[in-house]
Amino acid sequence: PGVAESWQITPSSMTFTLRADARWSDGTAVVAEDFVFSWRRMIDPKVAAPYASTMFPILNAERVHKGELPIQALGVRAEGNQLIVDLQTPCGYCLAVMAHSAFFPIKQSFYAAQADKYGAEAEYLLYNGPFMLTDWTHGSRLSMKKNPFYWQREEIHLNEINVGYITADNRTRLNLFRDQQIAVARLGAETVKDAAKSGLRLRTFPSGGMAYLGFNHRQGRQTAKVDVRRAIASTFDSEEFVNKIIAIPGYRSTQSFFPSWVQ
């Protein structure tokens, strides 16, 4: 949606009209074919893309991913400056999902020129967003600068972004934030309580994740009986469990596998 100036959605299709001023960081136009190439690559079973299943609402996507149909059968095509997506089934959440990075376009000629180096380093990537990666020390740091060809560049008020510390350790991130080495830190379950007790300002946001309790269905187990599972489920207080047992700020109980934003 960020590259489109408008879109129309019906139960059977989605049509995106691309911005005429959408550009890659090399100055060339972002075209509908860039999305077709990218999406076909993602659904290719040989690629084994981890988010390929997010495309399954698209016509033939699941069968293509299983190898039952050729990649060209995927229900996506370019017509001029429009990207047309045919749906296998009505999809109320598809517009939100298509903002995920897995659906980003790829310029085919650039991809082919990089061969197997595509995406391996900053110089082997092409960008159509507000910033370009200029330095990437894997697992340590990265730097970005403003993309001079971005269609809304006048609204971007930062010239550079420097991420001086990259770590998967939640405790390290919190300590770096406390030492004013970083401006924002994403917290984990083991650090969010400490941050709250310290009086730090916390912001919560939907993570796209869900936790649940599962039953052991092995033969001979009491929980293999559906009536036992129903009895436990009917007496389980999710509000009590989340708010008093887990007791992590930002966690919410839910009664459905579907997130609240699904229409």
For the regions a protein language model found, what residue spans apply to each?
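Gly/Pro-rich hinge or "lid" segments in bacterial periplasmic/extracellular proteins
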Residues: A61, G67, Q72, G80, ...
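Solvent-exposed, polar/charged alpha-helical surfaces in well-ordered, non-transmembrane soluble domains
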Residues: E5, S12, E33-R41, A96, ...
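Local pocket/hinge segments that shape ligand/substrate recognition
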Residues: E155, R186-Q263
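Ligand-site clamp/hinge motif
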Residues: G119-L125, P148-A195, R230
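A structural "hinge/loop" feature
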Residues: P1-E5, T28, C94-F104, G214-N216, ...
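Aromatic- and charge-enriched surface segment that lines or borders ligand/interaction sites
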Residues: E5-T54, E79, I84, R173-L176, ...
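Sec-exported extracytoplasmic/periplasmic mature domains
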Residues: R23, R40-A48, P90-G92, A99, ...
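Periplasmic solute-binding protein
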Residues: Q8-S25, M98, P206-G220, P259
